[in-house]
Amino acid sequence: MKITGGRGYVKFDLENGYIMKAEGEMLIDNTFLVYKDTMKSWEVPHNNEKVSDEQVENIIKTSCKMMNKNTIHLIFE
């Protein structure tokens, strides 16, 4: 998975054609707060497919495993 973003969003690229954009905000100490309730849809061309709670949880788990002292830390709320 690739994780990219900007000041008010983060994108989770599953590297299989599926990308999810979530809103959030940059905090202090290299931390980004991800608004979990905005993780509802895939980017085009999969925007008509439903996102399951299990898929969201898998993205969160994978993201947490990828974090280390050299990356921005994500907090999901």
Question: Where are each of the predicted segments found?
Answer:
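Amphipathic, interaction-prone secondary-structure segments
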Residues: M1-L27
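Acidic, low-complexity intrinsically disordered segments
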Residues: T31-E77
